[in-house]
Amino acid sequence: MVLSDGEWQLVLNIWAKVEADVAGHGQDVLIRLFKGHPETLEKFDKFKHLKTEAEMKASEDLKKHGNTVLTALGGILKKKGHHEAELKPLAQSHATKHKIPIKYLEFISDAIIHVLHSRHPGDFGADAQGAMNKALELFRKDIAAKYKELGFQG
């Protein structure tokens, strides 16, 4: 899967909006993930006790983790597909330590698309959504290949 220069530009344009409030976007993404797929919450010992959206919104730890997740993703997206160095340690930790299935990366990708659309409807039209979907699919495909190298069937 290859994105054109124009598609990468669409991805990076919307990502610039994310970077104005990485922690807030990250928190929204995780809340969307956990509400839509409560089973994903079980992978996070630190957040298992958060049962309501209000509890999630009040959690500084959740906000910090959202910041960590989207900061890492932003670093990967900015590499425009040349993300081997960034992906390797991420795949290692997610496969061997956290045991995060690829399906969960699909879930969080959907949450990212939803949050971007809800926060930036005027800047995240069909073209930008399509480009971001392709970029996230490329990320998932490449991390799945790393998982396979590590012997994780996630």
Curated annotation (Swiss-Prot):
Domain Globin residue range list: 2-148
Gene3D superfamilies, sorted: 6.10.140.2100, 6.10.140.2110
Domain of life of the organism encoding this protein: Eukaryota
GO process annotations (BP): removal of superoxide radicals
Pfam families: Globin (PF00042)
Binding site for heme b: 94
Residue numbers binding O2: 65
Catalysed reactions, as listed in the record: Fe(III)-heme b-[protein] + nitric oxide + H2O = Fe(II)-heme b-[protein] + nitrite + 2 H(+); H2O2 + AH2 = A + 2 H2O
InterPro entries found in the cross-reference section: Globin, Globin-like_sf, Myoglobin
Binding site for nitrite: 65
Main localization, broad class: cytoplasm
Compartment(s) of residence: Cytoplasm, Sarcoplasm
A GO CC term attached to the entry: extracellular exosome
Subunit note: Monomeric.
Family membership: Belongs to the globin family.
Protein name (database record): Myoglobin
Natural source organism: Balaena mysticetus
Gene assigned in the entry: MB
